[in-house]
Design a protein with these regions (language model features):
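Core catalytic alpha/beta fold that binds nucleotide/phospho-ligands
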Residues: 1-212
Length: 212
């Protein structure tokens, strides 16, 4: 299926979301397959994510992708900075020739409530409650998933395993308007870095991205 969302974030950075409805053979015509991936669904997600890179930048060099010890894919020459995410039937990718980037896509689910203590501070949880005051429990679950996705995109932007989602990744404010918004964040690993994470809700999913 075609792209369900695409945005030229700035002159050198592009974001895309792909609904995976094709068989493996569709992607294998262009994308090399990692032989270590044996699960059919994970293999399809892997192929779709890499296919999307070249949809955004046709000259993107698939063959030069390397995997860091942190499992983050990268290009040694850093000609392109990129991030890939997939969840269920969707793959998301962001590619830039000049900015550091991170992206995450998540399915909205009530399961996130069971693990909220692993990624949300008390202050952040109180902020979510204030945003859902007089609104439905559905919005509460949507915002929980969104905060998880926001922090995942920050984690991918940084690209190092040694990140504590509560200690190092702080969401200071969320500005929500209908099905999209912006989160003002602080990254506190090595030095205090202010970052904005944009997010979009679509088809019961959330995609979040950060560019710096």
């Amino acid at each position: 299926m075609p792209l369900v969302y695409q945005q030229n974030i700035n002159p050198v950075t592009k974001l895309g979301v792909w609904h995976i409805g094709e068989p493996e053979n569709f992607f294998l015509q262009q994308v090399p397959l990692e032989r270590s991936i044996t699960h059919p669904n994970k293999r399809l997600q892997h192929l779709a994510g890499r296919y999307l890179l070249q949809e955004l930048y046709p000259q993107f060099p698939y063959s030069l992708i390397r995997i860091a010890a942190t499992r983050k894919p990268f290009l040694e020459n850093e000609l392109y900075h990129f991030s890939i995410s997939h969840c269920g039937a969707y793959a998301a990718a962001i590619v830039s020739t000049g900015n550091r980037v991170g992206v995450d896509v998540e399915l909205m689910t009530t399961k996130v409530i069971k693990v909220k203590h692993k990624f949300l501070s008390q202050k952040e949880h109180a902020m979510i409650h204030s945003l859902t005051l007089n609104n439905s429990i559905e919005l509460y679950h949507q915002l929980l998933t969104t905060t998880w996705s926001i922090k995942e995109s920050l984690y991918k932007w940084y690209g190092d395993n040694e990140v504590d989602f509560i200690e190092h990744l702080h969401i200071e404010q969320i500005n929500l308007k209908e099905n999209q918004g912006i989160a003002d964040c602080l990254f506190l690993k090595d030095a205090a870095i202010e970052l904005q994470v944009h997010f979009l809700w679509f088809n019961n999913n959330c995609v979040s991205w950060v560019v710096s």
